[in-house]
C-alpha cells in the first residue's frame, strides 16, 4: 500500500542534531523517518516541514534563519540521495518520480511567522520550493492567531483570526498555488480562510474534535466546510490529539484502532474524499503504536478491520492526497 504523508518535523530534528554536533543521516537514523523507513513503508510522497518556534529561547535566534537552515537541510538531502528521493514542485514532478520508483519530497513550512509579514519573503519561499505553509504554529504572529495561548493552556481563539497582513498572505499564497494549511490556526482564522479564500486548502495534521476535545482538532462544522471547499485533512498520530484527555496526554493512547475511529468520523461527517494522512512524525513524543514510518501496514489493517473497503484505504493512504495536489499545486 502506497503512503502519502502531509506532515512531519524531520527537518527540524536533523537541523537540531547538526547544531548539537551529532549530525544524523537521512539514510538511517533513530528518528521516526529516514529513507530506510520510508522505503519499508512504501512511501510515495513525504511532506517535509521547515518548522519554526517563534518562542525559541536560544539567544540571537532568527525565525527566518531557522526556516532557511531547515530548507538547506532539505536541499542537501535531495542532492545526496537523488536515486532514492527527489524534490517535487509540480504535479508533473510527482508523476515523474513515481514512474522512476523514487520517493517524492515536498517542502512545506510550519509557522508563517518566519516570513515576518513580508510578501517578498513569502515569494522567496515559493522560489525555494515551499508548496504548503501553515499561517501559524502555537504563537501569535503578523498573520493570524493560533489555537494556543503562549505559556498557558491550549484554547480556541474564537474572536481573533487573520490580520490584514494575513489576508494579504492568503491572497498571495492562492495566486502562487502555495497551499494554505490551517492546522494550528485559530477557529476564527479557519473561518476567515473559508469565507475569504477561493481555492481548496488543507489541514495537514488535525483530527476530529468530536472524538477528542482538543482545539488542534477540527469541529464537525469545520470538517464539512473543508470538504465543501475541496480540501483535505491529514490524520495525526499524536496521542493527545486522538484520545479524550488533552490535559493529561500521558494517559492518552495512540493506537491504530483510535486513528481508524477518527478516520470513520471524518468519513461520516465530510465524506471519504476529505481523508489523508498527516503523521506529525518527529514532532510528537510519547508512545505510539505506529513507532516509525515503516509501520504503516498496521494502520492499513486497522482500517480494514474497522470496515473500510480496500478502495477507501487506498484513498486515505495516498489517492485523495494525490488528487488534491494534482489539482492544486
Task: Name each model-derived stretch.
Residues 2-5, 45, 86, 104-108, ...:
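Structural preference for beta-strand elements that scaffold enzyme active sites
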Residues 19-40, 298-300:
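Short catalytic helix/loop segments, enriched in acidic residues and glycine
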Residues 117-127, 149-202, 215-229, 257-275:
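Histidine/acidic residue-rich metal-binding segments in metalloenzymes
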Residues 236-237, 270-293:
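Short acidic/histidine-rich active-site segments
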Residues 291-329:
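Mid-to-C-terminal alpha-helical segments outside catalytic/metal-binding sites
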Amino acid at each position: 500500500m502506497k503512503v502519502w504523508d502531509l506532515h512531519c518535523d524531520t527537518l527540524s530534528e536533523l537541523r537540531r542534531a547538526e547544531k548539537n554536533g551529532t549530525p544524523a543521516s537521512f539514510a538511517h537514523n533513530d528518528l521516526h523517518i529516514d529513507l530506510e523507513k520510508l522505503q519499508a513503508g512504501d512511501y510515495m510522497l513525504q511532506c517535509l516541514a521547515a518548522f519554526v518556534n517563534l518562542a525559541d529561547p536560544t539567544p540571537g535566534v532568527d525565525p527566518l534563519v531557522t526556516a532557511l537552515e531547515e530548507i538547506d537541510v532539505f536541499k542537501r538531502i535531495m542532492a545526496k540521495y537523488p536515486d532514492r528521493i527527489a524534490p517535487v514542485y509540480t504535479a508533473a514532478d510527482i508523476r515523474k518520480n513515481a514512474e522512476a520508483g523514487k520517493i517524492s519530497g515536498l517542502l512545506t513550512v510550519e509557522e508563517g511567522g518566519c516570513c515576518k509579514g513580508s510578501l517578498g519573503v513569502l515569494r522567496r519561499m515559493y522560489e525555494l520550493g515551499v508548496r504548503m505553509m501553515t499561517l501559524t504554529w502555537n504563537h501569535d504572529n503578523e498573520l493570524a492567531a493560533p489555537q494556543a495561548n503562549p505559556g498557558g493552556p491550549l484554547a480556541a481563539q474564537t474572536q481573533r483570526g487573520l490580520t490584514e497582513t494575513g489576508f494579504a498572505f492568503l491572497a498571495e499564497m492562492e495566486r502562487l498555488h502555495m497551499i494554505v494549511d490551517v492546522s494550528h490556526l485559530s477557529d476564527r482564522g479557519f473561518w476567515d480562510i473559508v469565507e475569504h479564500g477561493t481555492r481548496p486548502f488543507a489541514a495537514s495534521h488535525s483530527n476530529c474534535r468530536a472524538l477528542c476535545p482538543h482545539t488542534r482538532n477540527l469541529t464537525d462544522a469545520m470538517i464539512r466546510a473543508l470538504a465543501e471547499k475541496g480540501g483535505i485533512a491529514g490524520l495525526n498520530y499524536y496521542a493527545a490529539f486522538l484520545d479524550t484527555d488533552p490535559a493529561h496526554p500521558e494517559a492518552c493512547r495512540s493506537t491504530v484502532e483510535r486513528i481508524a475511529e477518527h478516520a470513520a468520523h471524518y468519513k461520516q461527517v465530510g465524506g471519504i474524499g476529505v481523508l489523508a494522512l498527516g503523521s506529525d512524525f518527529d514532532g510528537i513524543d510519547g508512545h505510539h503504536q505506529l513507532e516509525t514510518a515503516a509501520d504503516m501496514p498496521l494502520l492499513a489493517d486497522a482500517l480494514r478491520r474497522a470496515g473500510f473497503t480496500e478502495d477507501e484505504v487506498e484513498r486515505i493512504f495516498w489517492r485523495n492526497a494525490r488528487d488534491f495536489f494534482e489539482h492544486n499545486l
